[in-house]
């Protein structure tokens, strides 16, 4: 992991230094995924079973996980694990419940009322990756907001065999539709539906290059499903001053570096001594990490940057837009108003990135690869949709009609204009008739 002095670089060199590792999908992945998606659409469950056997080297007895299997998985877990998962569930639920919005009702002018109401997305699909270790935390991050939002149907897919921890957390989140399928075939099944797997409106969750490509393809097809956000490799950026603990910084950088060879970690500090001590601490801590080889590969594209000031650190961070941003300075809270682009921010010495990954309450599904400029961390709103309502009285329409008529004429949309004027004419006729009735009665 190299150390550089920011001011010693030209603008082009500075820009090049902040380039993320390239995402190498390749035409072959695109073609493979397209074939898988088409196969699942055409042959449904039969294709799912064959593809699962081909890619995961196992043919499940049943595509759907039974209630008995979930109960058995729960019984196999230790009390310690259950308690940890329950605590994480409570914290995540508490934070996401607080994100509920109240209906909005505004009278924009006399007789014109506008409202905004929220409804849950009817059906959602959650993808939980397989791999060497189970990811119950991802089930929590997706399942809890889906549950709180009130999504009527929640489908969960994960490669077989599904870990006990995943099944237990699914139960905590009230998820009963769980399927033994993974990879791009699972994304296709949720996007288009099969005899066993229900079609969903939106798909959430991380995955490898094949899963990411499948999500991209189905989201670009109007017959497919929406997705949560673009995905990329994990990343963390740390802003530190002279009060920061180098051991803490090193641990935080390595916690992201161990995710994968394509992860990127960055330190920004105006203190050369901090950069040097962090570099030493990284080498010491690497010696005891089981995933040290993976972390070393990630460190190859990672950097320790020495700046002139903390203000310069903030400027660089805002330009880079990290997935995770850790602020270890004397007064970290004071920097928050100055930070514009980050997925999730961790303030102070006692807020390691790991707590956000698991149990602080915030969501760990975050935009990466610079998408923090336009995307937000996953939250309750992602499992909901907003509808607007307007209601006008007759007097309200009369007041607003000239504005609408003028604008419709300017845009050459006569039917729009007519939808207003036909009502105004009807009102005028009613008023004339009413006046005549009054005159007749008085006579």
From Swiss-Prot:
Residues annotated to bind Zn(2+): 256, 259, 357, 416
Pfam families per UniProt: Histidinol_dh
Alphabetical GO biological process terms: L-histidine biosynthetic process
Superkingdom, taxonomy of origin: Bacteria
Single GO molecular function: zinc ion binding
Keyword Acetylation in record: no
Enzyme Commission (EC) number: 1.1.1.23
Family: Belongs to the histidinol dehydrogenase family.
NCBIfam families per UniProt: hisD
Protein name: Histidinol dehydrogenase
Organism: Photobacterium profundum (strain SS9)
Gene name per UniProt: hisD
């Amino acid at each position: 992991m190299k150390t550089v002095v920011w001011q010693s670089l030209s603008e082009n060199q500075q820009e090049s230094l902040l380039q993320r590792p390239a995402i190498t999908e390749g035409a072959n992945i695109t073609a493979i995924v397209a074939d898988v998606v088409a196969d699942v659409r055409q042959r449904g469950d039969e294709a799912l079973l064959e593809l699962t056997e081909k890619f995961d080297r196992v043919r499940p007895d049943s595509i759907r996980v039974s209630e008995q299997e979930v109960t058995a998985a729960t019984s196999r877990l230790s009390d310690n694990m259950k308690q940890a998962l329950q605590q994480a569930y409570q914290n995540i639920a508490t934070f996401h419940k607080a994100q509920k919005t109240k209906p909005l009702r505004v009278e924009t002018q006399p007789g014109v009322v506008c409202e905004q109401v929220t409804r849950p997305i009817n059906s959602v699909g959650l993808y939980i990756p397989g791999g060497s270790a189970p990811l119950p935390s991802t089930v929590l991050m997706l399942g809890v907001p889906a549950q709180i939002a009130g999504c009527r149907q929640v489908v969960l897919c994960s490669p077989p065999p599904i870990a006990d921890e995943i099944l237990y957390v699914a139960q905590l989140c009230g998820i009963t539709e769980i399927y033994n399928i993974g990879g791009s075939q699972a994304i296709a099944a949720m996007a288009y539906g099969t005899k066993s797997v229900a079609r969903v409106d939106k798909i959430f969750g991380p995955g490898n290059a094949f899963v990411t490509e499948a999500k991209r393809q189905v989201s670009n097809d109007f017959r497919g499903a929406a997705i949560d956000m673009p995905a990329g490799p994990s990343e963390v950026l740390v802003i530190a001053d002279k009060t920061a603990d180098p051991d803490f910084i090193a641990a935080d950088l390595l916690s992201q570096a161990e995710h994968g060879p394509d992860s990127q970690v960055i330190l920004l500090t105006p203190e050369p001594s901090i950069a040097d001590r962090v570099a030493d601490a990284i080498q010491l801590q690497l010696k005891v990490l089981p995933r040290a080889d993976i972390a070393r590969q990630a460190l190859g594209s990672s950097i320790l940057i020495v700046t002139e000031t903390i203000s310069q650190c903030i400027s660089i961070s805002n330009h880079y837009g990290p997935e995770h941003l850790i602020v270890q300075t004397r007064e970290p809270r004071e920097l928050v108003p100055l930070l514009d682009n980050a997925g999730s921010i961790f303030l102070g010495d006692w807020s390691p990135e790991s707590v956000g990954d698991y149990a602080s309450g915030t969501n760990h599904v975050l935009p990466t690869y610079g998408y923090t400029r336009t995307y937000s961390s996953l939250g309750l709103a992602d499992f909901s949709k907003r509808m607007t309502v307007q209601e006008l009285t007759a007097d309200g329409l009369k007041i607003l009609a000239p504005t609408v008529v003028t604008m419709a004429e300017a845009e050459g949309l006569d039917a729009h204009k007519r939808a207003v004027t036909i009502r105004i004419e009807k009102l005028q006729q009613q008023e004339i008739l009413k006046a005549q009735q009054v005159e007749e009665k008085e006579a």
